[in-house]
Amino acid sequence: LTIMDSIRVSIIQTDIVWENKQENLRLLHEKLQSLRGTTEIVVLPEMFSTGFSMQSQTLAEPNSGKTISTLKQWASLFQLAICGSYIATDNGQFYNRAFFLTPEGEYYFYDKRHLFRMGREAEHFSAGNKRIIIPYHGWNICLLVCYDLRFPVWSRNVKNEYDLLIYVANWPIPRRLAWDALLRARALENQCYVCGVNRTGMDGYHLKYNGGSKIYSAFGEEITS
């Protein structure tokens, strides 16, 4: 691990209004207003605007759709980077697409590689096939999604490519022990900072969530404040 300038990361751990993009965007706008000037990166849960829904055909948007267009405006307005994931459509396929939007208008995205078959995600979405490393404020950031956490080879930090590993998730209560243990394990084995962001509340499939969002140092120490 090299010595770098510090970076301020804020986690938004929240309930998600089921399949209601407009309301979830409204609630996010309120939270971003309160974070103006206090942080450099805001991290949202997986599928922050809909919840972990399999209604890909009715909820999907292109990169040029309202959700990403709105977030681009807010990243510029509030002068912070925003990352999370949403239901995307691209070339006739549907993806659980993670995004990273900078105040300068840069847009990076990563399509979830490991789809959660037990939740039938693979029946409604296509898997991505490449990682992305995002340069931001002197840091290199790797952005992954939920079930990717269970596949350590996919996140392997070969040649110290990245400094911060971000997982955005909808990780339910029955599997919380795995979430807690694997986030710390990824920090230790990759010698990097790890940020995991989960939701709260209950989704439309009656799965319950209790957060547990955390940031770990490369030494496995929890540094969330």
Q: Which residues make up each language-model segment?
A:
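Cys-nucleophile CN-hydrolase/nitrilase-fold catalytic domain and related Cys-dependent amidase chemistry
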Residues: 21-22, 29-103, 108-109, 172-186, ...
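Extreme N-terminal starter segment of soluble prokaryotic enzymes
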Residues: 4-11
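CN hydrolase (nitrilase-like) catalytic-core segments centered on the catalytic cysteine
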Residues: 65-83, 150-225
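Active-site catalytic loop in hydrolytic enzyme cores
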Residues: 89-160, 174-181
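Structural motif
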Residues: 40-41, 141, 164
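Short, acidic/polar
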Residues: 23-32, 149-156
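Short polar catalytic/cofactor-binding loops
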Residues: 13-18
